[in-house]
Swiss-Prot record:
Role summary: ATPase subunit of a proteasome-like degradation complex; this subunit has chaperone activity. The binding of ATP and its subsequent hydrolysis by HslU are essential for unfolding of protein substrates subsequently hydrolyzed by HslV. HslU recognizes the N-terminal part of its protein substrates and unfolds these before they are guided to HslV for hydrolysis.
Residues annotated to bind ATP: I22, G64, V65, G66, K67, T68, E69, D275, E340, R412
Designated name of the protein: ATP-dependent protease ATPase subunit HslU
Membership in a protein family: Belongs to the ClpX chaperone family. HslU subfamily.
Location in the cell: Cytoplasm
Organism superkingdom: Bacteria
UniProt subunit comment: A double ring-shaped homohexamer of HslV is capped on each side by a ring-shaped HslU homohexamer. The assembly of the HslU/HslV complex is dependent on binding of ATP.
SMART domains noted in UniProt: AAA, ClpB_D2-small
GO molecular function annotations of the record: ATP binding; ATP hydrolysis activity; peptidase activity; proteasome-activating activity
Disulfide-bonded cysteines: none
Gene that encodes it: hslU
GO cellular component: HslUV protease complex
GO biological process: protein unfolding; proteolysis involved in protein catabolic process
Stored SUPFAM superfamilies: P-loop containing nucleoside triphosphate hydrolases
Length: 464
């Protein structure tokens, strides 16, 4: 699917999201359109391309119904830089706390890491060969010429029926034998001594009137001026290979290209998910001052509208970044946001609270369903676990009942219920339960473990 990621149709995007998220079709439909519009914009006439702005989305719904998961899966589908921030963590400029521009810097950081990973993949074969040769040189140094003829620096020998012509041929054969052993992992525990670059001490800069990006640039510049120190370390070949792969990859990757591509990726494909947007909305009911709530909204406005943000990798224009905001809006309403910010989130989608039937489907259908996760965990101990259908229905009923009576935390309730149900089993494996055995979870077992707790409301508040 990698080659076609940018070309998925809205129907295909929804089908992909359906593999992981149950229900919420309106939300899936709208994010699918937003993602496809990215591709449409990139293929529009050059004159109009700059004029087409993304339609930002506001997701409204209680916790645990899939708001964050929809945004995260969308970013994976698009192979796009993605960052999640909480609006309540930001403060108005001038107050102590994170400023809103830091979300763009986080997004660029994600993009840089993505591009670096792609570039490393491109040079992987070449770098692997270089690292292999370095490790071989450490184990079997090549033959050096002396005044007395050729002498090998290695005393290693190999089993062969043929008598080598000279030391150089023996050395080559030994190296090839060791090359195969390195590739197969046979020598992973063998110790070698390598020079490792040491990280220089952190350089502190007193901010004063400087913004965060300027301070980071100065810190990086001073850090680059410091001499690079190396230290000899004795490591296993497995550990040495990891370090050498990083160092040799860095030599082949042009960081200027990485920065340029990362900024392009951020500007045209970046997705910022702003959670808890309702926490910075003023409900207008309180008499006290709303400390910096409206200020945070006003600081958010230019970022969402489109502005230039300085980062340590360069200037990023936020005009075409897709913003997805989410909030429960229990106390406040979307209309409590300042009008200018409301206007920047033209698409509003209300997500439904999860029903008992939804819980059942969540346990059974998604690729990453909780039941499959527990099966994968126990399979590592060679124990198989099976869930009867009526057991899944009983778990769903209990989770739904607890959400109604205690606190509605959405699908996260399934985690607490399943954890309590399987607690004893997870503790007993492998000491009391034999390997290659099968454990069956029945409705009777679910009732035995959970029904009593659900009936005791005071206890269920603390345990489930």
């Amino acid at each position: 699917m990698t080659a076609l990621q940018g070309f998925l149709t809205p129907t295909e995007i929804v089908a992909e999201l359906d593999k992981y998220i149950i229900g919420q079709h309106d939300a899936k439909r709208n994010v699918a359109i937003a993602l496809r519009n990215r591709w449409r914009r990139m293929h529009a006439d050059a004159d109009m391309r700059k004029e087409i702005m993304p339609n930002n989305i506001l997701l409204i719904g209680p916790t645990g119904v899939g708001k964050t998961e929809i945004a995260r899966r969308l970013a994976k589908l698009a192979d796009a830089p993605f960052t999640k921030v909480e609006a309540s963590k930001f403060t108005e400029v001038g107050y102590v706390g994170r400023d809103v521009e830091s979300m763009v810097r986080d997004l660029v950081e994600q993009a840089v890491n993505m591009v670096k990973t792609q570039k490393k993949e491109e040079v992987k074969i070449k770098v692997s060969q270089v690292v292999e040769d370095i490790l071989l040189d450490l184990l079997i140094p090549p033959v050096k010429s002396t005044g007395m003829g050729f002498k090998t620096a290695s005393t290693q020998s190999i089993d062969t029926n043929e008598i080598p012509d000279n030391d150089q041929e023996l050395n080559e054969r030994t190296r090839e034998l060791f090359r195969e052993k390195i590739r197969s992992g046979e020598l992973d525990e063998r110790k070698v001594e390598i020079n490792v670059q040491q990280q220089g001490p952190g350089v502190g800069v007193v901010g004063g009137a400087m913004d965060e990006a300027s301070m980071m640039n100065i810190q990086e510049m001073i850090g680059n001026m410091m001499p690079k120190k190396t230290k000899k370390r004795k490591l296993s070949i497995a550990e040495a290979r990891k370090i050498l792969l990083e160092e040799e990859s860095a030599k082949l990757i042009d960081m200027d290209d990485v920065k340029d591509e990362a900024i392009r990726k951020t500007e045209n494909m970046g997705i910022i998910f702003i959670d808890e947007i309702d926490k910075v909305a003023s409900s207008k009911k309180g008499n006290g001052p709303d400390v910096s709530r409206e200020g945070v909204q006003r600081d958010l406005l230019p970022i969402v509208e489109g502005s230039a943000v300085n980062t340590k990798y360069g200037t990023v224009h936020t005009d075409h970044i897709l913003f997805i905001a989410a909030g429960a809006f229990h106390v406040s309403k979307p209309s409590d946001l300042i009008p200018e910010l409301q206007g920047r989130f033209p698409i509003r989608v209300e997500l439904n609270s999860l029903t008992e039937a939804d819980f059942y489907h969540i346990l059974k259908e998604p690729k990453n369903a909780l039941t499959r996760q527990y099966q994968a965990l126990l399979s590592s101990e060679n124990v198989n676990i099976e869930f009867h259908d009526d057991a899944l229905k009983a778990i769903s009923e209990i989770a739904f009942e607890l959400n109604v009576e205690v606190e509605n935390i959405g699908a996260r309730r399934l985690h607490t219920v399943m954890s309590h149900l399987l607690n004893e089993l997870l503790f007993d494996v492998p000491d009391k339960i034999e390997t290659h055995s099968t454990v069956v979870i029945t409705k009777e077992l679910v009732d035995q473990k959970l029904k009593g707790l659900v009936k005791n409301r005071d206890l269920s508040q603390f345990i489930l």
